[in-house]
Amino acid sequence: MLKRIGKMAELFDDHSLLQLGASGQIDGQGFTLVGRLQYAYGEGDERGTWTEWHALQTDGSSAYLSEDNGAYVYSRPVSSNGAVPPASELPVGHSVALGGQRYVVSSNQPVTLIAAQGELPKLPPLGQPFTVVEVRSEGGDEASQRVLSFDYGSAPPAVTLGRGVVLTDLNMSGLKAESAQEGSGRQFACPNCGSPVTVKLAESKAITCPQCHTLIDLSKGIGGELRHAVQDEPVRPLIALGSVGQLNGIHWQVVGFQHRLGQSPDDDESFGWTEYLLYNAKRGFAFLVDAEDGWSLVRPTTGAPKVTGNGAKAEYAGATYSRTWSYNAETSYVLGEFYWPVRRGQKTFNRDYAVGERILSLEQTGSEQTWSAGAKLDFNQVARAFKLQDKAALFRRQDAAPVSLGDAGSTLIKIIVVMMLVLAGMWLLAAMFGASSSGSGSGWGRSSGGSFGGYSSGGGHK
């Protein structure tokens, strides 16, 4: 017997390619999207939303296709065997053993179901906050990375286990046509200056006005009241928004840009870097990071590296990374569209790691942490990718190799090296005989590891 269990807010149109009735295949089994849920997390300026699709599999069981840091996670319910720890015992960053596998807590925060549509399993309390905790598999290779979610909206808590997926790998059909997606009223007037603002991406949760650069929150859709913040001191991106470039064989479009400031906890000096949000319809999102010591391309990870040595080392995908920097970060300026509710003044604590050309970065708040992984890029490669070879000199950073000076230059370098060794020896002798020396200054720059650039949109549930 069906009965009315409450009244919900109307679903806001997130203009996703996904829709009810769309179908696909995973692990040799078909599925059809039959239900849609929208959740909210955070409060005030930190409020964000995500969408979760209920998938009915051909064997009659349920699964979920959910947003995850600009990508997707496909999750299935699993039995907890009564072993789910209380949410209070799962602080963010905590490592925990579950079912013989080690996980790291990536998110622990209250969420609220705000809207639902279609065929759905038992729903959490309507409009009432409940806690969702997400843990990500620790270490291992990329193919084995998993997301485990605990939904404390029911008793006992519901548990789902998922892995990262790409929509094109799911052989999906019945998706919204691109023309329908693009023509569905995605333009609105800027709440600050009245100029038209066009939203181009389905996943956007924040956007800036192209005229006055006001930052506008889209987390509640564009039909309601739009929260906004006027931005001063504009920062010009080196690569223009809308530019398309090919990096590592993949075509990316620049859809967002943010300038960030960092400061070591034991240092008064700050440093800055910029991050370009890149988008590919088949691959999702990535970050092109422009830092003092070079360029890098990074993407959020599904799992979490295994951190050892009191945070000094991180093991990921068969490699051991060493920590390069730890610092507080703050977003100072943004342009374009973003899939999370970015704002000026957002603060995180970051740690960067590196091994050779590969890099890892951890970004953490009180309720969430996000890992990203990638590699360094040559500045010429970045300039060529976006057809800016004539401006390549502007892309050069501290990691760039010196220009060849020929035989004479080689001799000069050898002389300089010898002089440096002599000076080092003199300094060592002076130190041995009681000479004192002062510590060096703080003229270091942020690693090019690339912090993720804001809050993630979650994992198995988000």
Where are these regions (language model features)?
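Low-complexity, glycine/proline/serine-enriched intrinsically disordered segments
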Residues: 187, 374-462
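Short, surface-exposed polybasic-aromatic patches that bind anionic ligands, especially phosphate groups
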Residues: 1-18, 22-410
